[in-house]
A protein has these predicted regions:
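Transition-metal
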Residues: 1-205, 278-296, 317
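A short beta-strand-loop-beta hairpin characteristic of the jelly-roll/cupin
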Residues: 59-71, 225-241, 329-330, 336-356
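Generic C-terminus detector
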Residues: 89, 341-384
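Active-site cores enriched in adjacent His and Asp/Glu residues with nearby glycine-rich loops
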Residues: 188-232
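Short acidic-glycine-tyrosine-enriched beta hairpin
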Residues: 235-247, 252-256, 348-367
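C-terminal, non-catalytic macromolecule-binding modules
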Residues: 259-307
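Conserved short histidine dyad/triad with adjacent acidic residue
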Residues: 313-331
Length: 384
């Protein structure tokens, strides 16, 4: 059976007050609306038409809801979490752990007796959080380390006072040392460095680094004593166009800046932060999970059949574009369908749910193919 989901909107301070309401076709209430969660994460599970949460239904009978193979492979846990994400302000500089790192970190936090909902707890669960974000409008982000020669060229072009040692570190290939030094610097030392960077950015004339200049100017003004501003110097600054994507495996350092997107991740809430945030920051733990291999080309596009190929073992995602026709999406395992434009009918063996933009539906593991009809665009997320 395919059923409609009722989803929770998270009101994190960085959220846009207008982007999600506009997508949903409702009046904004003036408050930030950052993320709409679709899935069975215990923090904010979707609700089924009968009032049960998807988390409770999965917990009661994983094999019936997920299918026997998926239930066994993911230890009875719903494998993925989907979100609509609307960033009005920058999110934190962050990375996510691998499965082994998450298990180890979770066991350490449990042994230390840190409550699972404590602000200073790093590992909320024992699962990794690889994720993909697909832009629904132009979306700005910092993603992965820029190749070192490009970062040296950026620093040479800006020539901020006091950054000579950093530039030399990068020329010598010492990215880990440079990132760790930046993120570990106290705020009294950071403030004049951010000030010098802001002055250099204001005086920069040229178009080779226009996106970088725009972002650094805003970060220097908004976070004058935050080491995350300096870390931003080291990351790829990208702008995704509609339906472009970025895939973030374990260890990828990133920060979303602004825009509306559809996001899918493994079913985890493990985030290790290093800056650009008022939330808990743990630099040594962040550095311990970071992948310091530079990322040359972060942008991912869909294949001809609409599939975004990530290789992630926790989920698969396909975009379906319809112009009055029908598409049969084969597959097994639990699926979430989210309409992002127009009106889509999502059906299974016994039922059909009509979805408008921002609405979603769930099909259980044994349901069989999912049939989509209508005019618009939708994402179909399934277990890998």
């Amino acid at each position: 059976v395919v059923v409609r989901l009722q989803n929770t909107i998270r009101d994190y301070a960085w959220g846009s007050p207008t982007a999600l309401p506009e997508l949903l076709g409702v009046e904004p209430d003036g408050k930030p609306q950052a993320e709409m969660w679709m899935g069975a994460h215990e923090s904010a599970p979707s609700v089924l038409p009968n009032g049960d949460t998807l988390y409770d239904v999965v917990s009661d009978d994983p094999a019936a809801v997920l299918g026997e193979e998926t239930a066994e492979r993911f230890e009875g846990r719903f494998p993925f979490l989907a979100k609509l994400l609307a960033a009005g302000q920058p999110l934190s500089i962050q990375a996510h752990p691998s499965r082994d790192q998450a298990i180890d970190g979770y066991e350490r936090d449990e042994a230390a007796g840190i409550p699972r909902d404590a602000a200073d707890r790093n590992y909320k669960d024992a699962w990794p959080k690889p994720e993909i974000l697909i832009a629904l409008e132009p979306f700005d982000a910092l993603v992965g380390f820029r190749p070192l020669d490009r970062t040296v060229a950026l620093l040479d072009a800006l020539a901020p006072a006091g950054f000579e040692a950093l530039t030399n570190q990068l020329r010598d290939g010492k990215l880990r040392e440079a990132f760790t030094d930046f993120m570990s610097t106290d705020r009294d030392t950071i403030r004049p460095l951010v000030g010098a960077l802001g002055e250099a950015v204001a005086q920069y004339v040229g178009d080779a680094f226009e996106l970088e200049r725009e972002t650094l100017a805003k970060l220097c003004a908004d976070f004058p004593d935050d080491p995350g501003v300096l870390a931003a110097l080291l990351l790829n600054r990208i702008r995704l166009e509609r339906f472009d994507a970025v895939y973030l495996p374990a260890g990828n350092v990133h920060a979303y800046l602004r825009g509306l997107g559809f996001e899918v991740m493994a079913n985890s809430d493990n985030v290790l932060r290093g800056g650009l945030t008022s939330k808990y920051v743990d630099v040594p733990e962040l550095v311990s999970v970071v992948d310091f291999e530079p990322l040359t080309d972060p942008v991912l596009t869909a294949e001809a059949d609409g599939v975004y190929e990530t290789g992630c073992p926790y989920f698969a995602i396909r975009r379906v574009d319809l112009d009055g026709g029908e598409r049969v999406v084969e597959g097994a395992g639990p699926r979430i369908v989210c309409c992002v434009a127009g009106t889509i009918d999502a059906g299974g063996k016994e039922s059909v749910v009509t979805l408008s933009a921002g609405q979603s539906a769930f099909a259980a593991g044994p349901e069989g193919p999912c049939i989509l009809r209508g005019s618009g665009a939708a994402f179909v997320v399934s277990a890998r």
